[in-house]
Amino acid sequence: MGRTLESKQQIVEELKGLLGEAEMALVLDYQGLSIKEMSDLRTRLQASNGVCKVTKNTLMRHAINGNGAWSNLESLLTGTNAFVLIKGDVGGAVKAVQAFQKDTKKSETKGGLFEGKLLSQGEIKAIGDLPTKEVLMAQIAGSLNALATKVAVGINEVPSGLARALHQHAESGES
């Protein structure tokens, strides 16, 4: 027996809620994946605030209808799709999907949408290759610390150089 109209409307409302919170969406061809593999993907995505939803393209079409930010997603709604909706750690979620695809070798990314722009597979891969927010903050902190150290050494070098010059002048005067 098929889904009732109420259950379909409930699914569409849930999708609208997830899309409202999401920063990025990936569309995966999940054909050939087992339930265990889909559960594995969902588990991997939890750490980076990603959600994997398998739903009919028609229901997703209803969810994005009238929402300009997600309207470009419609061009990817063909075939058997799993939708990865990401909020928060976009790079981490993309890395999780890429690691999953590398491990299973069954799923492929059809495309994605970030800030209303359709992304190619190359652009999605580039996002996955970006360092995490924590790594970037550590790199910036290291750069700032190195700059402060160089300034401190430079400021300290002026009196040290003057002291060495005076010492050398005093020694040459004694001879």
UniProtKB/Swiss-Prot annotation:
Transmembrane segments: none
Self-association and partners: Part of the ribosomal stalk of the 50S ribosomal subunit. The N-terminus interacts with L11 and the large rRNA to form the base of the stalk. The C-terminus forms an elongated spine to which L12 dimers bind in a sequential fashion forming a multimeric L10(L12)X complex.
Gene Ontology molecular function, alphabetical: large ribosomal subunit rRNA binding
UniProt-listed SUPFAM superfamilies: Ribosomal protein L10-like (SSF160369)
Biological process (GO), any one: translation
Entry keyword annotation includes rRNA-binding: yes
GO cellular component: ribonucleoprotein complex; ribosome
Name the UniProt record assigns to this protein: Large ribosomal subunit protein uL10
UniProt keywords, alphabetically: Ribonucleoprotein, Ribosomal protein, RNA-binding, rRNA-binding
Family: Belongs to the universal ribosomal protein uL10 family.
Coiled-coil stretches: none
